[in-house]
Amino acid sequence: FIVRPDSVHLLRDNTISLKDVFAGAEWFPTATPAPQFGFLPLITGTLWVSLFAILIALPFGLAVAVYMSEVADHKIRNLMKPVIELLSGIPSVVYGFFGLIVIVPLLQRVFDLPVGESGLAGSIVLAIMALPTIITVTEDAMRNCPRAMREASLALGASQWQTIYKVVIPYSISGITSGVVLGIGRAVGETMAVLMVTGNAAVIPHSILEPLRTIPATIAAELGEAPAGGAHYEALFLLGVVLFFISLLINFTVEAVSSGKRK
């Protein structure tokens, strides 16, 4: 996006303003005679799916990492570790099929929805995809906590769970942050799985239970059909730049929160 100037050509066109692009509520690039290039529905969908995915994945990932590092015996840990690492290598389209067959019908029944494809379905699928990364990195960070620190805490009368909460987790916060950032990176940039389960409706969602569309899904679905050099093509390149800055913003936010906890 930096090497190619396509991402900025759209804004140089006098017929399309910065406000129309970033505050526009309609994405209809093939409309005639006036195509609509509003990014707001796509930005909103990306943020909703990504943030809900992390809210789902983080507590589960941290709980499993704590269990593997501090509670599980050697045999169980050796059984769980390769299984979790194997999950991280499964193609995203397989997760998408799983979401389409299992999660989408389940949400449709539980919430009595007209269609099960929704932002929540995408968030759950992305959370499942991010879990192996979060668990693996967090568990490795916790196991690096010095044994002497654990023994000193227990010698002072702290229980095992107090030691985990007051000693192990604070010591491992940098590793936990790395796992979360890597998980967020996969969630924000994921394409195929989200494309299959979110409904792909380019409208601003009023609920996480409504269909929506994310930026990566839009780029993947439309780039092949957009005429090279046209306004639609340039808008998709600009969407890629926006996605890059959204990823940076979320990562900086996570890093700032974890830095505050370290202090």
Residue ranges and their predicted role:
Residues V137-T138, L154, Q160-T198:
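Transmembrane alpha-helices
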Residues F60-G99, V137:
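Cytoplasmic-entry segments and transmembrane alpha-helices of multi-pass inner-membrane transporters
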Residues R109, V194-F244:
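Interhelical loop and adjacent transmembrane-helix boundary motif
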Residues E85-S123, A127:
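Generic hydrophobic transmembrane alpha-helix motif, especially the helices
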Residues L42, T46, P82-E85, G89, ...:
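Residue-level signal for discrete positions within transmembrane alpha-helices
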Residues E139, R143, R147, L154, ...:
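C-terminal transmembrane helix and the adjacent membrane-cytosol boundary/short C-terminal tail
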Residues T46, S50, I54-L62, V66, ...:
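Hydrophobic positions within alpha-helical transmembrane segments of bacterial inner-membrane proteins
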Residues I2-A53, D73-H74, A221-Y233:
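Periplasmic/extracellular loop-to-transmembrane helix junction in inner-membrane transport proteins
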